[in-house]
A protein has these predicted regions:
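A structural signal for the main folded, soluble domain(s) of proteins
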Residues: 29, 33-39, 71-72, 143-145, ...
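Extracellular cysteine-rich, disulfide-stabilized repeat modules
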Residues: 13-16
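Pre-Walker A adenine-sensing motif
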Residues: 2-4
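An N-terminal structural lobe/cap that precedes and organizes the functional/catalytic core
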Residues: 6-11, 28-136, 141
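C-terminal, charged low-complexity interaction regions
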Residues: 194-258
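Long, hydrophobic, well-ordered secondary-structure blocks that form the structural core
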Residues: 140-209
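Extracellular repeat turn/loop positions enriched in glycine and acidic/polar residues, especially those
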Residues: 18-20
């Protein structure tokens, strides 16, 4: 297939604005709603919109039993990993999505967008508004405050660590996709540029890959089981002052199979 087809919106596909209508019946041919053309690249506009519009919701599958406010849930455990990094001053350095991204001009190429690091309170590090108070306490209790250190033989621990890394990344992808839809609705001509359609295709693909994984996690959580997760533990023989979490789809598995 010609790869160029991924960089255009087709008449009969669902409109990227999220209306549910076909593109030709919705945003095709619409003009830009913004009165003044922004000098910022569209991808920077999306990042800025994300900083302002993080959705508050609970990602736990047991929606009927949500209780309490949507809280700033930590992707990395505040009372374990973050506390070790924060020390007595209770601060860490992290990529700051609340700050204005830097736009680095590169001669003859697209500008590079960079997110700066900032010193932030441990209470604010790696937080997202993606769990209600009840489910934040229940879903991650096995690895949170008062729980023993990580046990390589504990299936519940391995499952919950995998789930936590996944669900926070899934939440961010969903929010990013919704914000793209909002931006497309306001500025169809700008967000039909090839580089923006490319970002949209990547977002579509990620959600397509993520959704069956979420369905698996949801079904296991509701059943109270921990199946379907294979964990590879790599032990570093000394402590390092760095921590991260992510969910990715590698090109090859641990045995080199594609």
């Amino acid at each position: 297939m010609n790869p160029l087809v991924y960089f255009r919106i087709f008449n009969n596909e669902d409109c990227p604005c999220g209306s549910g209508k076909k593109f030709k019946e919705c945003c095709k041919g619409k003009t830009d709603q913004e009165p003044v053309q922004s000098k910022k690249p569209p991808e920077v506009q999306i990042m800025e919109q994300m900083r302002k519009s993080m959705v508050k919701c609970c990602m736990h599958p047991d929606q009927s039993n949500c209780n309490g406010k949507i809280k700033n849930a930590h992707a990395l455990q505040n009372n374990k990993i973050i506390s070790l990094l924060a020390g007595t001053e209770r601060h860490v350095y992290t990529m700051d999505k609340k700050r204005q991204p830097l736009i680095i001009p590169i001669e003859g190429e697209e500008p590079e967008v960079m997110v700066e690091f900032s010193r932030v309170s441990a209470n604010d590090a790696t937080t997202e508004t993606c769990f209600c108070d009840r489910h934040d306490n229940i879903a991650f209790a096995v690895i949170e405050k008062g729980a023993p250190d990580f046990d390589v033989n504990s299936e519940p621990m391995k499952f919950v660590y995998a789930y936590k890394a996944f669900i926070f990344e899934y939440y961010k992808q969903e929010v990013s996709h919704k914000i793209f839809q909002q931006c497309f609705k306001k500025r169809p001509p700008v967000f039909q540029l090839p580089q923006m359609v490319g970002l949209y295709r990547v977002s579509q693909l990620r959600l397509k890959e993520f959704k069956p994984v979420k369905r698996h996690f949801d079904s296991e959580i509701m059943a109270g089981t921990y199946n379907g997760i294979e964990t590879c533990v790599i032990t570093i023989p000394e402590r390092i002052n760095f921590a991260n979490y992510t969910f990715i789809a590698p090109d090859y598995d641990l045995n080199g199979k594609g």
